[in-house]
């Protein structure tokens, strides 16, 4: 039976206004819209009155419910029937944890009530199209129609393909019907194999074969034999990549054989809890570094949010599934798309060339895709610290004559680093009889055929198959699985995981054969033991679906009880679905139909399928010299600062958590003005050291339209000039991931790909001492469609994205582009050696040209000398600022440095030649360094020692003030206010934020950028940062116990434990499941801290589901009430823990006036480094800190204080319960965005109880307790940041 329960309003006023504006623009006479959530409960038994009241209370969250009956025509948007939304999975979990076992499933829809004039059927279809994503959702016209969401169907049996009766044609038909993308020779192979077996194949076997042998999974082109211009080539592409490892194997521990590559890390204290006692401690051991970069291009073109989200999720799983289990740590992301064409902000180079119906626009991709990727990283608890964004779409005369080149099929790049124990780097041995396990969520009828689908050019497959290959994301589930993997690797030698792979393209049909085959075993499986939420799925759908957040593992039979215990504690679902066999055979039994859908020797599936041969021709580029008529420097500057590749990326940065883990030493945002221009991302290796890891990206794809090899060399060069900004040492410490995107089969591209791989793998990397131990290829970067009567194609340029990773010697020595105005000199190191080529530059692009000669690596020895010289100068502390030259050339490099330093520049380019345009806008490799004037001679001497004397040019100095002036021989070449340039540079991000978020907030942030008087972040402390008030208490040897409380989805517990540990506490890991099952109680604890993250993925209101699982469980409720009423206890709630505790008001004495915390005014997750002031309050944790003003990490989507009315706010203030407020950079309490990131009245962001024993706050002091993890800080701070005082105050209070 189904119950319907009304929910809160679903759209804020500005979202409704945006919808109305869209309808008006489409000439649809819609006058008014009201939208509210509607909940549907599928019940297996009736609820009594108390249970019904409990369910109603559970589903009461967010803004107050509307009291009126809605007016207008109902359009009910729900998830597509036959799918289960991530919201449903998490909300159902909460209902069960609150004791409501009668609830089979909760689901949620949005009821839109549309008031409109008379609309035709076609117009109503337009309205519904605007309101839902057809890939994920459906529209009903009656609330009762939602019954279809819970419809159950009978299982369907396996289908046989009549190969023996119909011959080869049966396979050809199945290939089309199932979208298998099989090549002719593969059809021959299958016909031969099954004829030898003497039986017909089942659909599931063909599907499994197609996924396992798709280009996506098998990399056929990279393993192919090559004939170019009639000449047999000596090596495959992959062999040339492997050549880098054969030449420079130094520091590589694992390459080419696992889900990620591993290199040597540093010996540090890894901080985690003991399995038996739950007590956190440091464990001194090597933290080796793993690295991986994936792409998820096809799904992102079809449905950007889930496409990008599952792209990030899949890459995170690759990291976790490395060796015998590892820990993902920090991420990077990248996008290449066609022109944005923002309405009202179209740029002169953006022509509309059309696109196929089934893919979304570049603007849609960049509105939704980054949000999806960020949301997954945020909820999983991984900071996203690095990225790139390129737009390109043009009709150009390239290798193949005049044609359309661009990114209708986008690049969505997801990568990152993690850490792994030395003894877990290599996979274990799978014993015969080992249990084969699926860890993670249930099978669902989604994401079918992703591997084969992404191996086709967009436009080749059927639209229904595109639907089928879109996945959905549940990062909170992946977090639970990762917690299990963490518990396993933390056991060291007792780790129950023998072998692990993630489930990706092809689902279990790819993952399980890969697992057993890699372990030298076969496997027998039971189909019906696979967890499934949809009983009507066919065997093919159960075995081959790509439900995300799953891993496959081999676990020794005798360790299964331990594994079971770990999973139950973390509430991570798992199923034993088979066991490993001696015989290399794969069998899948179906208990329901008592038959065998799969019964194959492994070598038929993964054996010697036909090897590909590429027989291709070379084409020469046809670029024309740049036509300069009509190009002025002033006009060029404004255009280039508007080009998204160059323009400010704040809209892509602040949506992503950049402080979680407490180990982020360098994020994108630089300096007191928080400008997104960092050269590279840097993390600390642990919470107790200054060793670290660095990541940087290089890519220069448009250059490939003129010179394939140069484009590839520049990508490597740019990654190197970016990562050089931190202290790494020997260049052999740097390892690269190479992600290759090409339109295979397009005239000239295959030969170009070979040329590019050869340039990097055989020549440049070996010469530099660089290794490429990991990478990925996507070989179908073309889109076809019909535009009227014309057949059109959009082909991407050959695109190599290089991600560089390295161990860092000392993270404190990372250099940023932030200029200083002390007596200084700016030096350009020009690795272009005066070539100043303008082909395929930003300048050429914004004037709709390609040019002829591009930049290149001009001298490999000098590139190596450059890296070594910068490393020497970093180690000697001779550099004040550093920024590489890239897109936009020298002018953009200097401008970004001036933005970061909030200063002026007096530059002189006389020494760069007479061609001013080329001097300012060429994109040859190089960098600008800032040094003290007194050090200039010594620095130039170091550069000369490294063979760079002829590359160094003095180009002026940074000065106070707002003028950005470039001269040559006394003549002004360009002069503008730095603030004006800063505003131009910000206009793209402003327009994107206006479109996507609350436009009022976007306007306020943009306005702030034009204020030259803004002093930036600054610090005023009322206490001595170096005084340790806990020292006398630590000296007694007594360590009070703090319960570090977490719920499923919480992700900030480790850094929180570390902060309390440093202050003299014994930090104990306490999961809510420990309390609910009675394994642990709170009676032994002196302090309790509820940590940040996304408990239950923030469904049913941030922190509210967590709170209700306490309030609705009598024993646990009493336990919390007793703790809060006990004198001599302390409690802290941070972020999600703050939201949770604010919902426990009825249990916490003196908290009656506490507010609720609701959706940010921006309607967006906000990750900021914000200034707060400590106010006079009873809070025991903030004693002695009153009046201090200091920055703190902020990361939340629901942090806005909501009070009942003005009287409630006045009472909260007059009782002195406000503990922290947001202030602007002038020190004034503020409600203005983004200084106040959530719009809370009076800047309120922390409150306390009347006794001061319980304090809750939205910002994260635990993420910045170490100075090194602050995005910016005054130079005189030592190891401890000022927020360490909170934790020491706690220790002091407990005596």
From Swiss-Prot:
Catalytic activity: N(2)-formyl-N(1)-(5-phospho-beta-D-ribosyl)glycinamide + L-glutamine + ATP + H2O = 2-formamido-N(1)-(5-O-phospho-beta-D-ribosyl)acetamidine + L-glutamate + ADP + phosphate + H(+)
Native species: Shigella boydii serotype 4 (strain Sb227)
Positions annotated as active site in the UniProt record: 1135 (nucleophile), 1260, 1262
Residue ranges occupied by any Glutamine amidotransferase type-1 domain in the UniProt entry: 1042-1295
Known function: Phosphoribosylformylglycinamidine synthase involved in the purines biosynthetic pathway. Catalyzes the ATP-dependent conversion of formylglycinamide ribonucleotide (FGAR) and glutamine to yield formylglycinamidine ribonucleotide (FGAM) and glutamate.
Positions of region (Disordered): 305-327
Name of the protein in question: Phosphoribosylformylglycinamidine synthase
Annotated binding of Mg(2+), by residue: 718, 722, 884
Recorded name of the encoding gene: purL
PROSITE patterns (UniProt xref): GATASE_TYPE_1
